[in-house]
């Protein structure tokens, strides 16, 4: 099966009587044009997107295949992240947190209750824990790309 475009979001489709198959696209794969994957129901899927995917990405609940019987839908699995919160009275440290995360080209998301979320790596966690007035904890959660702060999301390292 070949999937070549994002057809919309799952909530936009009538799913009555249709099988929904999910294909896992990790956060760092979301902006790649070509994938070879297997859905949760065992269907082999080739994904070949056009250049627009380099800017848009593949996100949770994107429908990439639809026919009368089946939908193939993107699932973004949970991943290790760092949840960053600011101690009361140290709200201005948000500028330092955002600068340090951005300087490392790491993706940044809004979290719940005035927190920030970034992808986990040990050096980042250690660095954030050393900033006065900042609490940083490792967690596993599903990224919400609608809450991204970063202009781009990629797996870029120096």
Where are these regions (language model features)?
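Helix-rich terminal scaffold detector
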Residues: 1-20, 41, 114-158
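Short glycine-/aliphatic-rich beta-strand segments at the starts of folded cytosolic domains
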Residues: 73-87
């Amino acid at each position: 099966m070949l999937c070549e475009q994002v057809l919309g979001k799952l909530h936009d489709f009538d799913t009555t009587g249709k099988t929904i198959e999910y294909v896992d696209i990790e956060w760092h794969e979301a902006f790649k044009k070509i994938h070879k994957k297997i859905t949760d129901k065992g269907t082999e899927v080739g994904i070949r997107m056009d250049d627009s995917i380099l800017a848009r990405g593949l996100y949770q609940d994107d429908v990439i295949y639809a026919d009368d019987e089946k939908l193939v839908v993107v699932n973004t699995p949970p991943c290790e992240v760092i949840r960053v919160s600011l101690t009361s009275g140290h709200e201005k440290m948000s500028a330092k947190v955002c600068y340090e995360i951005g300087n490392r080209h790491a993706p940044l998301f809004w979290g719940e209750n005035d927190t920030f979320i970034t992808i986990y790596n040990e050096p980042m966690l250690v660095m954030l824990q050393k900033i006065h007035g900042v609490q940083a904890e490792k967690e596993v959660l599903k990224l919400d790309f609608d809450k991204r702060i970063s202009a781009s999301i990629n797996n870029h390292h120096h």
